Curated annotation (Swiss-Prot):
Source species, domain of life: Bacteria
One annotated Gene Ontology cellular component of this protein: extracellular region
Listed Polar residues bias regions: 53-63
UniProt-listed InterPro entries: PorA
Annotated protein name in UniProt: Porin PorA
Record lineage: Bacteria, Bacillati, Actinomycetota, Actinomycetes, Mycobacteriales
Pfam families linked: PorA
Organism: Corynebacterium amycolatum
Region (Disordered): 53-78
Sorted UniProt keywords: Cell wall, Ion transport, Secreted, Signal, Transport
Any one GO BP annotation for this protein: monoatomic ion transport
Function: Forms water-filled channels that favor the permeation of cations.
Signal peptide: 1-35
Primary location group: secreted
Amino acid sequence: MKRTLGHALIIIGAALIVIAVLLPTFLVPRLRVIPLDTVSDTITEVRDGTLLDSSQLGKNEPTPNRKNDPRCKAETDEEKRDLPVHCFINDKTPMQSKRHVEIEEPADEKIATLQVGTTLLRDDRKEPKNLINAILDRITVDRSTAYPVDDPISSVAINAPQGGSDTKPPTFTRPGIQYQFPFGAQKKSYPYYDVQAMRNFEIDFVGEETQDGVKVYKYSMTIPPQNLYESLTEHFTRDGRKLTEADKSSLASMRLSFPAHKWGLEGDDDVELDRYYTNVRTVRVEPTSGVIVNGTEEMFMFYAKDDKEAEEIASKAGREKEAKEQNRTAMKYTAQWDEGSKGRQMDRAKEARKSLTIGGTVAPWILGILGLVPIVIGFRIRSKSA
C-alpha cells in the first residue's frame, strides 16, 4: 500500500513539474495579446500654440492679438479683404489634444480593431466652436504582434464626417505600428504610420529612461515636410475612388490661393500655396507590454509653394524667420501628455507586465516546487517500504 502511494506521489510530482516547464509555452502567448476590453484615454496639457484662425479669416477680421498690429488696420471692406494672412494667425491660442481608443468589431482571439478618435481643441472657446481638427481612425491589428493585418480594411476619416455613403472614407492596407508597440519591444527602429501624412516612417530607439520607477524605452522620429494636399488627395483617390464632397471639404484648407501681398509677398497676382506638415514625435514605451506610456509631438503646419520652399521654411533659420513674420503658419503646437494620461497608461503597462510575470515565471516556479514535494515524499515512502 505504501509503495503504491509512493508511486502515485512521484507521478503527481512529475506531472506538476512537466506542467511547470510547459506552462510558459502555452500560457504566455495567450497573455501576450492586446486585450479585447482595451479602452484608453490620453489627453495633452493645455499649451499655447500658433493657429491660423479660419473663422476670422473668413470674416476678414483680425484675431484679438493682431488688433493693434499696424499691418492689420482696416476700415473699409476692400481694406479688410486685402489684410495679410498674418492678421489671422493667433500665436497665443490655448490648445489641447484628446484621444480615445476602444476595441470594435471585427475582433476575436487573433485580431482586434482599434477605433481611435483624436480631436484637437482650442481651450478658449466653447463647443462646437472649439474644434480645430478631428480624426476617426480604424485599424485592425494582429493581437500578438500589434502590426496591422495584411488586408485593406483600415480607414481614416478626416474631421470625422457623419452621414451616408458619400462620407465613408476609403479603406486600405495599413503599414506600420501606431498605438501599441509589440510585446517585448526591442532597442531598434520600427515602422510607424503617421496618420496626418498618411505615410510610414521609421521611429528610432534613442535610449532608456525611468518613469514612475519603471524602465522605459525612448523612441523618436522626425517627419520631413509633407505636402498634405497631395498626400490626402492620393489617399482619397486610391484604387480609382472618386473625390466626394466630404473629401473636397477636407481638402479645402490644404490648398489656398490669395493675392501675393496677402502671403507677405510682393505683387497682386494670385499665389496658390499648399499646406505642409512636419513633426518631431517622441514616445516612451514599457518594453515588456509594448504599452506607450508617454508621448510628445512638435507639430508644425505651414503653407509653401513647393517642396523646396517647404524645406527652407522647416529649417532652423526658416522657423525663426516665420516665428517673427508669421505669414505662412497654419498651426504650430507642442503636444505633451498630461500626468493623468501617463499614469493611466503606466497602470495598464504594469498590469500587463504583472500578468506576464505570473504566467511566465511565478506560476511555473510554484508548480515546480509543488511538484518536487510529492516526489521527495514519494521516494521516502518507497525507500521505507522496500
